[in-house]
């Protein structure tokens, strides 16, 4: 009798853990978003960190004397904190100006992780 209660308790605990795991939010947003093509000949011309708990969405803009050829947006704490949605809202790659809008996935109003935006320009 005692062992059947133990087995029942273990089965119930396993069922509860499976249900809890199924309710955790899944993130399909990547930890890194890239625009353009990385090249060793490019120079880093911009670096900015959007800190955790800042408002989402947030826009990052930059005007360079030379063309911006590659942009890397990365979540600094990926995993359960998820990724980030990034899109070019003004300007373009291989142009001297660009505006990138960053959004926390899941319609949250604050970023759950630090986000780093790095831009690389032509020499």
Q: Language-model features: where?
A:
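Short, structured beta-strand segments at or near domain termini in extracellular proteins/domains
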Residues: 112-123
């Amino acid at each position: 009798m005692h062992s059947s209660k133990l087995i029942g308790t273990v089965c119930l605990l396993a069922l509860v853990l499976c249900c809890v795991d199924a309710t955790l939010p899944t993130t399909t947003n990547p930890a890194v978003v890239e625009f353009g093509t990385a090249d060793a000949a490019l120079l880093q011309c911009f670096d900015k960190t959007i800190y955790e708990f800042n408002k989402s969405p947030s826009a990052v803009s930059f005007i360079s004397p030379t063309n911006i050829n590659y942009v890397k947006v990365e979540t600094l704490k990926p995993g359960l904190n998820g990724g980030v949605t990034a899109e070019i809202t003004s300007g373009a790659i291989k142009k001297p100006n660009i505006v990138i809008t960053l959004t926390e996935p899941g319609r949250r109003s604050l970023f759950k992780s630090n986000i780093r935006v790095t831009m690389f320009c032509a020499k």
